[in-house]
């Protein structure tokens, strides 16, 4: 969008005000920190609206029949995904976030709740602010009895993603937004109950995931006390039955995984579905339930488990004392059979995924991971597969993505139920879409309603 010079300068100053790194001296809580930045963001939106007739791109037939790939058509505040640079969160790279965001009371990895704060406000919170936020999440994690009864009613063969989506939707009995909207609330105030619902869901979703993971212990999980002095990921691990000091590395992996997967721009299925349903003023519980159903699709959220299955099959075929040629031959066998190599390529990225590198850096500091033959296959594949895929010639990005490592790392730490990896992804992905739902309401964004066209219309 080409803004006039004066307007562009003004918008730039506003953006700097909104996105600057700041440590507030009064140590406001998250809602207060958000409230402080809303006026500037609204002013920026008002400036941008004046340029409503400006052209920001063109729509090609390939965009329409190709899943709208590459088409800039929605507002998303928390992150920007560049094809070459990868993901940035309010301008910060993953390495920036790992360096700047507060860590847990134990462990060395950035906290996903600190990432949520950054996504929502554009500011890096202090350690004390994050500790207070972690405490709030622990205190708001309780589930009503009807949710426990609902979880007990599920048939044993119901897919875990179906379960977590149903429970998330059913939690809208707790929605402050739905209740206040029914009574009547000023549109300018929509963001406050939306914020409250988003925090409530963020607090509850680890326990919901644990209900799905431990279906024979519904009452135990439903009433398990969380440690208010610990962080969101630590308490999630406790709910999964993997607490304690002996699982410290798993806790750090979970922190890193949840932070890395929290937001990846708005065009992916889970984020877009949440935004779409939320644009109809559905509450955050209903909206994110829709996002979870999108995440359940094999083209979106099932990649980590597919990578693990493929790697384990590869190990069974070539053993643990493999050569580079063994790996190369298995890759070619996969491609020649008409299958894809799981964990490689990306819908937007054209360079190596920095999230994959973050997980590999994590592994590089753990001798037990490096010694694991399954992980060694992951590492060797990352060295050989790009060349094979380039020679094959049918991919725009031959590099590994985050899924190439995440499932295998979970497997190493004893989390060996691949069907539940997407559920964990669903806990993480709540971060970004819930942030955007809050901003959708704070900015008064309208219902989403694109225009469709049929094939004959395109042919003309």
UniProtKB/Swiss-Prot annotation:
> What this chain does, per the record?
Catalyzes the synthesis of (2S,3S)-2-methylcitrate from propionyl-CoA and oxaloacetate and also from acetyl-CoA and oxaloacetate with a greater efficiency. Also has citrate synthase activity and can substitute for the loss of citA activity.
- The annotated transit peptide is positioned at 1-24
What Pfam families is this protein classified in? Answer: Citrate_synt
**Induction remarks:** Expression is highly induced by propionate. Also induced by ethanol. Transcription is subject to CreA-mediated carbon repression.
Which residue positions are annotated as catalytic? 300, 346, 403
Q: Which family does it belong to?
A: Belongs to the citrate synthase family.
Please report the name of this protein according to its UniProt entry. Answer: 2-methylcitrate synthase, mitochondrial
Q: Which reaction does it catalyse?
A: propanoyl-CoA + oxaloacetate + H2O = (2S,3S)-2-methylcitrate + CoA + H(+); oxaloacetate + acetyl-CoA + H2O = citrate + CoA + H(+)
Q: Does the keyword Nucleus apply?
A: no
Q: How does it assemble?
A: Homodimer.
State its Enzyme Commission number(s).
2.3.3.5, 2.3.3.16
GO-annotated cellular components: mitochondrial matrix
Q: How does activity depend on temperature?
A: Optimum temperature is 45-52 degrees Celsius.
Query: Which pathway does it operate in?
Result: Organic acid metabolism; propanoate degradation
Chain segments annotated as coiled-coil in the UniProt record: none
The molecular function GO annotations come to:
2-methylcitrate synthase activity; citrate (Si)-synthase activity
- What is the activity regulation entry? Partially inhibited by ATP.
How activity varies with pH is as follows:
Optimum pH is 8.5-9.5.
> Which top EC class is named for this enzyme in its record?
transferase
Phenotype reported upon loss of the gene? Blocks propionyl-CoA utilization, as well as growth on propionate. Impairs production of several polyketides such as sterigmatocystin.
């Amino acid at each position: 969008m080409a803004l006039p010079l004066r307007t562009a300068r003004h918008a730039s100053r506003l953006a700097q005000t909104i996105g600057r790194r700041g440590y507030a001296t009064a140590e406001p809580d998250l809602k207060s920190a958000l409230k402080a930045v809303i006026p500037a963001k609204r002013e920026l939106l008002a400036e941008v609206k004046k340029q409503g007739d400006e052209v920001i791109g063109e729509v090609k037939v390939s965009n329409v029949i190709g899943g709208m790939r590459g088409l800039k058509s929605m507002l998303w505040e928390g992150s920007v995904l560049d094809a070459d640079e990868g993901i940035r969160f309010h301008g910060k790279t993953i390495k920036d976030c790992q360096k700047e965001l507060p860590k847990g009371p134990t462990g060395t990895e950035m906290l996903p709740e600190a990432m949520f704060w950054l996504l929502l406000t554009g500011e890096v919170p202090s350690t004390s602010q994050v500790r207070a936020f972690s405490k709030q999440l622990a205190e708001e994690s309780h589930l009503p009895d009807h949710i426990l009864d609902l979880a007990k009613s599920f048939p044993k063969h119901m897919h875990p993603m179906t379960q977590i989506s149903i429970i998330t939707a059913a939690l809208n009995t707790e929605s402050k937004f739905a209740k206040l909207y029914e009574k009547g609330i000023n549109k300018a105030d929509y963001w406050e109950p939306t914020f409250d619902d988003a925090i409530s869901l963020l607090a509850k979703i680890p326990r919901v995931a644990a209900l799905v993971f431990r279906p024979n212990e519904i009452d135990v999980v439903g009433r398990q006390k969380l440690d208010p002095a610990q962080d969101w990921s630590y308490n999630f691990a406790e709910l999964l039955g993997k607490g304690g000091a002996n699982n410290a590395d798993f806790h750090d992996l979970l922190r890193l995984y949840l932070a890395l997967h929290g937001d990846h721009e708005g065009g992916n299925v889970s984020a877009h579905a949440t935004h779409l349903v939320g644009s109809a003023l559905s509450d955050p519980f209903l909206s994110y339930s829709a996002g979870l159903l999108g995440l359940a699709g094999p083209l979106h959220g099932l990649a980590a488990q597919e990578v693990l299955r493929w790697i384990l099959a590869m190990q069974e075929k070539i053993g643990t004392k493999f050569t580079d040629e063994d790996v190369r031959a298995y890759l070619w066998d996969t491609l020649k059979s008409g299958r894809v190599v799981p964990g490689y390529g990306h819908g937007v990225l054209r360079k190596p995924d920095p999230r994959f590198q973050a997980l590999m850096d994590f592994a590089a500091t753990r001798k037990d991971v490096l010694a694991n033959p399954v992980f060694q296959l992951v590492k060797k594949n990352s060295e050989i597969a790009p060349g094979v895929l380039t020679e094959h010639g049918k991919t725009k990005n031959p590099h590994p993505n985050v899924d190439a490592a995440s499932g295998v790392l979970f497997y190493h730490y004893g989390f060996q139920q691949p069907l539940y990896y997407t559920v964990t992804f669903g806990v993480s992905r709540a971060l970004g879409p819930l942030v955007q739902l809050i901003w959708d309401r704070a900015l008064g964004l309208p219902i989403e309603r694109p225009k469709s066209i049929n094939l004959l219309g395109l042919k003309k």
